């Protein structure tokens, strides 16, 4: 039994089948990239994995239990960062991290922002930051979270090369410590092929 299991998922949108019979199992320490063309259902699949959406058929299990039965404990173990940063634009970068990680002290939050490339921007309201900087505020949570499972939708959008390298290193560290990372990205990952498992949605069944 894996930590996260997908069984025979079916997803239809506007009378079109995005994927059907989709099944896979993820174990501790896995790093997974969901691939496929635009419209293949990558973001839809991520939302199904978070429990934000329900499949038309099939189920997602966490540690052998259907998500709807373990929703609270599952979400305690989940960090989800979608297309939108999901941050409070009227708060500063530092205040955002305090909001999402109330048990993190200021030193930890400042270090997380520095790791994300935001040193010197800690006290600036988020609505005054660029799109890339706002994205970094959300991604700084990767250095604070205790969640086992990270689900990240295009995390490298509007991030420069150095930022992508730092984020990639953080994901590698997380999986080496037994965590799971699931992401979509159009950018090549600068890591050994052997470290990445790819699940393709180029067909109605994942390959």
UniProtKB/Swiss-Prot annotation:
One record GO biological process: cytochrome complex assembly
Binding residues for ATP: 36-43
EC number: 7.6.2.5
Compartmental location: Cell inner membrane
NCBIfam families xref list: ccmA (TIGR01189), PRK13538.1 (NF010061)
Protein family membership: Belongs to the ABC transporter superfamily. CcmA exporter (TC 3.A.1.107) family.
UniProt subunit comment: The complex is composed of two ATP-binding proteins (CcmA) and two transmembrane proteins (CcmB).
Name of the featured protein: Cytochrome c biogenesis ATP-binding export protein CcmA
Origin organism lineage: Bacteria, Pseudomonadati, Pseudomonadota, Gammaproteobacteria, Enterobacterales
């Amino acid at each position: 039994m894996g930590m996260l299991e997908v069984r025979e998922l079916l997803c239809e949108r506007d009378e079109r089948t995005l994927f059907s019979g989709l099944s896979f199992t993820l174990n501790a320490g896995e790093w997974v990239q969901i691939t496929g063309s635009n419209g293949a259902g990558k973001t839809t699949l991520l939302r199904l994995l978070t429990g934000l959406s329900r499949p038309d058929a099939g189920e997602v299990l966490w540690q052998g239990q259907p998500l709807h039965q373990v929703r609270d404990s599952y979400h305690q173990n989940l960090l989800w960062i979608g297309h939108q940063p999901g941050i409070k634009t009227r708060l500063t970068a530092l205040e955002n991290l305090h909001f999402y990680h109330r048990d993190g002290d200021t030193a930890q939050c400042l270090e997380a922002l520095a790791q994300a490339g935001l040193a010197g921007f800690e006290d600036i309201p988020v609505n005054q930051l660029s799109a890339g900087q706002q994205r970094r505020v959300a991604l700084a949570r990767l250095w604070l979270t205790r969640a086992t499972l990270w689900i990240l939708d295009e995390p490298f959008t509007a991030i420069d090369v150095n930022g992508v390298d730092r984020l990639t290193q953080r994901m590698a560290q997380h999986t080496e410590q037994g965590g799971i990372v699931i992401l979509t990205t159009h950018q090549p990952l600068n890591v050994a092929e052997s470290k990445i498992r790819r699940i393709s949605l180029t067909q109605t069944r994942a390959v």
